[in-house]
Amino acid sequence: MHFPSKEQIAALQRQYPRGTRVELLGMDDPQAPPMGTRGEVMGVDDAGQLLVRWETGSSLSLIPGVDSFRIVQKGGRS
């Protein structure tokens, strides 16, 4: 598994700051929330995955470049 550099992680943190609201458009995972489910980005982990708290109660992470999602509202909390 390839882990992103510190610079790449920092770029993801700027692109998806804590509090950013996202909407799931598609995810190839049997545990995925339904398409259209919205959630809040809680942070970015060391693997470059977005830690998301979904409105369904799930906390499944998003993988930028693999999962399909859109930003609904940009966050700004640190």
Language-model region placement:
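Basic/aromatic-rich interaction segments and small domains that mediate binding to polyanionic partners
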Residues: H2-R77
